[in-house]
Amino acid sequence: MSSTKTIGIIGGGQLGQMMAISAIYMGHKVITLDPAADCPSSRVSEVIVAPYDDVDALRQLADSCDVLTYEFENVDADGLDAVIKDGLLPQGTDLLRISQNRIFEKDFLSNKAKVTVAPYKVVTSSLDLEDIDLSKKYVLKTATGGYDGHGQKVITSTDDLEEANALANSAECVLEEFVNFDLEISVIVSGNGKDVTVFPVQENIHRNNILSKTIVPARISDSLAEKAKAMAVKIAEQLNLSGTLCVEMFATADDIIVNEIAPRPHNSGHYSIEACDFSQFDTHILGVLGAPLPTIHLHAPAVMLNVLGQHVEAAERYVTENPSDHLHMYGKLEAKHNRKMGHVTLFSDEPDNVVEFGKGIDF
């Protein structure tokens, strides 16, 4: 019997494209569902062109594939439930629903996985903001939607309450106490439904709420790094994880606080393609297929730089001058401002000397 599988990927952006490349290297066939015929995955896989919530298209994908996965969390979970058969979607839809709603996510992290999160409260209207202690700093986030800083309002004084009240009256929200952290970090973990494997802790630098630079390993103590990895594994085991999960965290001087989870490979893990013996995309494919998972080894300290639309020319010049560094371009046709167009990975044990592309250009 052939071990070749047909893998259906919901979403044809850069994450779906890199999942597909890993699957193809392993000898599998890939079919992608995406609304755009010219999506990045169209360069490496067959594409069913349809909206993500098109139940007929989801059924066509399901009927054509041995296993399904998704590249992002904004997938119609109800639509998936309507078409999937037992075992067809190893990640399941429970994880989707948890990651789609910050209220569900906070409840899962604090009460089921029992990891440390920032103090928070559920906000259903502006009335829930009337008694907050303005000697503290807060972040108000909509329960659903929002990415790269959208759907959020920082509250530091009464001057911020008008916008915060409007946000609270527009949608269910979560109010989090602001964490005075030293570093933003993340941990990639992959599971196959039984076992898990974990990647090195990554240090992340954001500009305008968009990831700009990832440094591996993160510059934190060994004890904090082990604590961060243990938290990620605990979350993965609570989920009986299949595939790859990213746990985003804050590192303080003496603690790790979990911020949120992404039920898929993550921008901060792209360095793993060159810097580890297996990438986060490799372990994702192995995980959803229920295959044995490798132990992850980092070849050498590495840095990943995001290439946004306004950075493309600078990135192309950079790799011309530094041909040993690795440029990945995703094949997006239009280089819009702040649109993720690619990334560069390089080996360096002096990460402060690696200049982000946005410096001197535009973040």
Could you describe each region identified by the protein language model?
Residues M1-Q100, F104-D107:
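ATP-binding N-terminal substructure of ATP-dependent carboxylate-amine bond-forming enzymes
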Residues L167-I220, E226-V258, A262-H270, F278, ...:
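Phosphate-binding core of ATP-grasp and ATP-grasp-like enzymes
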Residues Q60-L61, I132, L167:
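Structural alpha-helical scaffold elements that stabilize or flank donor/cofactor-binding regions
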Residues I24, I84, S110, L134, ...:
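Anion (oxyanion) recognition and catalysis
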Residues S3, L286-F363:
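Peripheral (often C-terminal) accessory segments that flank ATP-dependent C-N-forming ligase machineries
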Residues V47-Y52, K121-S125, I155-T156:
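Short acidic-hydrophobic, aromatic-tinged amphipathic segments that line or gate anion-handling sites
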Residues Q91-K153:
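A conserved helix-loop-beta module that forms one wall/lid of the active-site cleft
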Residues V123, Q152-S157, I188-N192, V216-A218, ...:
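Short beta-strand-to-turn element immediately C-terminal to the catalytic PLP-Schiff-base lysine
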